[in-house]
From Swiss-Prot:
Localization terms from the record: Cytoplasm
Gene behind the chain: glyS
Gene Ontology cellular component list: cytosol
Oligomer and partners: Tetramer of two alpha and two beta subunits.
Major place of residence: cytoplasm
Gene Ontology biological process terms, A to Z: arginyl-tRNA aminoacylation; glycyl-tRNA aminoacylation
Swiss-Prot/TrEMBL catalytic activity: tRNA(Gly) + glycine + ATP = glycyl-tRNA(Gly) + AMP + diphosphate
InterPro entries: DALR_anticod-bd, Gly-tRNA-synth_bsu, Gly-tRNA-synth_heterodimer
Enzyme superclass (EC): ligase
Record's protein name: Glycine--tRNA ligase beta subunit
EC assignment: 6.1.1.14
Record keywords, A-Z: Aminoacyl-tRNA synthetase, ATP-binding, Cytoplasm, Ligase, Nucleotide-binding, Protein biosynthesis
PROSITE patterns: AA_TRNA_LIGASE_II_GLYAB (PS50861)
Organism: Geotalea daltonii (strain DSM 22248 / JCM 15807 / FRC-32)
Family classification: Belongs to the class-II aminoacyl-tRNA synthetase family.
């Protein structure tokens, strides 16, 4: 009979950022544990608030399923004599398994025949297994940081106060540290700080709401969304959409309520990004805008309690925000007194990275790269690119960015505009940080794009040059994001920009700082880009198609992407599979480079001449289509060789006894192979 499993872990306040991952980890762990224990189960749901993590599993089997367990023993020749009697080794294995030697069976493996014992294991009651599974699950939930409390040896994100563990309404007894499992949960810390009994999951939800706790984050998020829209409308404005803040606030409260506050309109003279950042990052406030998107002097904050007099809460929030915005206004007014170009020199005293020099030195390096990109792709922009690259890090030494690091680049743009800098240059100052998150906004201007690419390439090459290479989940310099940003900019803009010369130039500028060989750095950086490119493209195209193209064509990302698109289309056609088979036949024979040219005077069979003429005809067409980036048309031309290739293999013995004839035939096949490889390595494609 199926039953319900319910677990709640009650704690001190866990950081909001820990909770979504903890929920996902709990679900994965319980699924793995139940499957490993041969316990059937149905739907799994996890929930979290700052003070509790919970999960419910529906339709859990009351008993573990039976299983046949096979234990391998020694080799047959070790366990049995030639006459079939059991050796001491065989008898010892049987005795160790608790069976008679007659129960030994023979199993054939890749390494030979071995003896084995197969025993039926009768499933036990699930409840007893859960007493071992649940404390192990709790212990295995991974957190960025965990702690001990009191004199306990166990660790968790925050000190634990209670555990509810029920199976079919009955307590699963176990202890985690000094906390014993039971059936008693607790209400809201300030509004209902009492214990209450739990019978099952449905009862738990009812009792939580009676005690001012909404355990389900999806429901809390819905309430918050509804509340902030209601309060914003009452205040005569609209909520500035901020999904990240909404997600964060959802995990900061157990029982949300929204209140509206205001700030002096005089603060609106400060750039809106600073005001929004201050409210969002430091206070977790939602900003308000009018119907045209203009920032209003108001905010909405989410409380974790219901209050009889919200004005008291509002006044406290307004007072804190006023101090923050006063600081911002002060920094803004002071910063405006010094032109950005005069701040550039100050970058000489700002350390970028101990092994890579100052921010000024970094700026000089990527400015040269950016100029080169402009020269190559948009020569008229060279002067603007030079100016944007020179100024784009200058706001790092302003008071505003020192206080609010999140507005770097944005403040550079604002100060540049106030000081009469060209609008496109000012825009590029902000854009060079883009994209600043996965899937984020890309630079709109070419000026911003060139500086962004150059800055990121210098960062990646610099770090790789001194051994600061990402490993596992560790990527302190956000190099993966930088590489993806470069790739996305190049693809979005359609830049005809080979990577190898750009990366080579960037590494060359690091002369004197390299702690590794240039050749090693170049190879590693290109592999790094290749990995990011493959990951990005396999989200859109079949993995084998991406691998096949990247194996032969990666330097120019726009070209490689176009080839991938064409090959993905071509693979759906009826003539794809026969063509792939033909290519593999060619590759199976031409495994080493042949250095002799094709000589048609050495042909001995008409099929050789036919294939050679077909190749020459197709080759010129393929070359033309490749230059025009019409890769689907190029593939169609390559496909026209299929008949001639098949006829060649049917009628011609490639490995002829005559060395000259043999090498000539191999050279012909090598030409065919190279034609295929203008697009992709067909050998990597699956049917």
């Amino acid at each position: 009979m199926a039953k319900e499993l319910f677990l709640e872990i009650g704690t001190e306040e866990i950081p909001a950022g820990f909770l979504p991952k903890a929920m996902a980890d709990m679900e994965g762990l319980i699924r793995k544990e139940l499957e490993s224990a041969r316990i059937g189960f149905g739907e799994v749901k996890t929930m979290a608030t700052p003070r509790r993590l919970a999960l419910v599993v529906k339709n859990v089997s009351a008993q573990q399923t039976d299983a046949e367990i096979t234990t391998m023993g020694p080799a047959k020749k070790v366990a049995f004599n030639d006459d079939g009697t059991t050796t001491k080794a065989g008898e010892g294995f049987a005795r160790g398994q608790g069976v008679d030697a007659s129960a030994l069976s023979i199993i054939a493996t890749e390494k030979g025949e071995y003896v084995a014992v197969t025993k039926k294991e009768i499933g036990v009651a699930t409840a007893g297994l859960l007493a071992e599974i649940l404390p192990r699950l709790i212990n295995n939930i991974p957190f960025k940081k965990s702690m001990r409390w009191g004199d306990q040896e166990v660790r968790f994100a925050r000190p634990m106060h209670w555990i509810v563990a029920l199976f079919d309404g009955t307590v699963i007894p176990f202890a985690f540290g000094n906390v014993q499992s039971g059936s008693m949960s607790r209400g809201h810390r300030f509004m209902a700080n009492t214990s209450f009994p739990v019978r099952d999951f449905g009862h738990y939800l009812e009792e939580c709401e009676r005690h001012f706790v909404i355990p389900d984050p999806a429901k809390r998020k819905e309430i918050i969304s509804r509340e902030i829209e209601r309060v914003a409308k009452a205040a005569g404005g609209n909520v500035l959409p901020d999904e990240g803040l909404l997600e964060q606030v959802t995990y900061l409260v157990e029982y949300p309520s929204a209140v509206h506050g205001t700030f002096s309109a005089e603060f609106l003279a400060v750039p809106k990004e600073v005001l929004i950042t201050s409210m969002r990052e430091h206070q977790r406030y939602f900003s308000l805008v009018d119907d045209k998107g203009k920032l209003l002097p108001g905010f909405i904050t989410i409380n974790n309690t219901l209050t009889e007099d919200p004005s008291v809460v509002v006044k406290g929030n307004e007072m804190v925000l006023r101090a923050r915005l006063s600081d911002a206004r002060f920094f803004f007014e002071e910063d405006k007194k010094v032109p950005l170009e005069k701040r550039v020199e100050a970058l000489k005293s700002v350390l970028y990275q101990a092994k890579l020099g100052t921010s000024y030195e970094k700026m000089e390096r990527f400015r040269t790269l950016a100029e080169g990109l402009a020269e190559q792709l948009q020569p008229p922009l060279k002067a603007k690119v030079f100016q944007a690259a020179t100024l784009c890090k200058a706001d790092l030494v302003t008071g505003m960015v020192g206080e609010f690091p999140e507005v770097q680049g944005i403040m550079g743009r604002e100060y540049a505009l106030l000081q009469g800098v060209d609008a496109e240059v000012a825009r590029a100052i902000a854009e060079h940080y883009l994209p600043n998150q996965a899937g984020g906004e890309l630079p709109a201007s070419d000026t911003g794009a060139f500086v962004s690419i150059a800055d990121k390439v210098d960062t990646i090459c610099g770090c790789f040059s001194v051994g600061l290479i990402p490993s596992g989940s560790a990527d302190p310099y956000a190099l993966r994001r930088a590489a993806l940003g470069i790739i996305n900019i190049i693809l979005a803009k359609g830049y005809n920009l080979p990577l190898i010369p750009l990366v080579t130039k960037a590494i060359g500028q690091l002369e004197g700082r390299l702690t590794r060989k240039k050749e090693e750095v170049l190879a590693d950086v290109l592999d790094f880009f290749k990995g990011r490119f493959i990951n990005l493209l396999t989200d859109r195209f079949p993995a084998d198609v991406v691998e096949a193209v990247v194996a032969v064509s990666f330097d120019n990302l726009v070209e490689a992407t176009a080839k991938i698109e064409a090959l993905a289309q071509f693979k759906k056609r009826d003539d794809f599979e026969p063509l792939a088979v033909a290519f593999k036949r060619v590759c199976n024979i031409v495994k080493e480079q042949v250095t002799v040219p094709v000589d048609d005077k050495l042909f001995q069979d008409a099929a050789e001449g036919t294939l050679f003429q077909s190749f020459k005809s197709a080759s010129s067409m393929v070359e033309e289509k490749v230059v025009q980036r019409e890769y689907l048309a190029a593939l169609t031309q390559i496909a026209s060789l299929k008949g001639a290739v098949d006829d060649f293999f049917d009628k011609v013995m490639v490995m002829a006894e005559d060395e000259g004839v043999r090498n000539n035939r191999l050279a012909l096949l090598q030409e065919i192979k190279s034609l295929f490889r203008d697009i992709a390595d067909f050998g990597k494609l699956t049917a």
